[in-house]
């Protein structure tokens, strides 16, 4: 926990994916991150922001090269315990296979649309390929999209099962006791 002169608390839960970036299982880990916290149909957005009205924003981000997934939200500092419990519940739900067809399809569509949009921007395409330079094999965006389409819900559940909580960080108000 860290205190600063802020009005919103920032809660981060850092998970190790335990999935090497060159593994074919990486695509399932990527979809796991999308289902957890990318887009308006993600579990964090629906449950923390919409259903419980706790967060100004709630999202997740996967860093392929570092093998980490961050789940994070901006909240009223008094809501830390509830928000942290809800994040943990959403990760557990994915581990337990509680992934709806809508969540799965929205995640696949979001990732595939992102990959398709790379061709519209030289800087995005450059950034994508720069990230690929550290890989044993370079997958172009179309190939990456094909791999995403091959991932099953069961693969995502297995990827979530490999994740381990590593770090909990909370930036809070100096006034919060």
Feature names for model-found ranges:
Residues 23, 79-83, 177:
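Short, conserved charged micro-motifs
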Residues 4-7, 61-67, 137:
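Short, flexible turn/loop "capping" segments at secondary-structure junctions
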Residues 12-17, 36-75:
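A structural supersecondary motif
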Residues 13, 30-32, 48, 71, ...:
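Buried hydrophobic packing residues in well-ordered domains
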Residues 105-177:
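C-terminal regions of mature proteins
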């Amino acid at each position: 926990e860290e205190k600063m002169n802020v009005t919103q608390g920032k809660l981060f839960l850092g998970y190790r994916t335990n999935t090497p970036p060159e593994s074919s299982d990486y695509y399932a880990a990527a979809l796991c991150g999308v289902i957890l916290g990318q887009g308006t149909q993600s579990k964090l957005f629906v449950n923390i922001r919409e259903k419980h009205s706790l967060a100004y924003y709630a999202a997740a981000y996967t860093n392929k090269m570092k093998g980490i997934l961050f789940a994070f939200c901006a909240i009223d500092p008094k809501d830390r315990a509830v928000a942290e419990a809800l994040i943990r519940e959403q990760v557990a739900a994915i581990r337990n296979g509680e992934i709806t067809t809508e969540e799965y399809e929205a995640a696949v569509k979001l990732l595939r649309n992102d990959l398709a949009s790379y061709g519209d921007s030289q800087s995005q395409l450059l950034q994508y390929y720069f990230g690929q330079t550290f890989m044993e094999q370079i997958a172009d965006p179309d190939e990456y999209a094909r791999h995403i389409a091959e991932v099953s819900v069961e693969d995502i559940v297995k990827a979530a099962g490999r994740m381990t909580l590593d770090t909990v960080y909370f930036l809070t108000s100096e006034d919060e006791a």
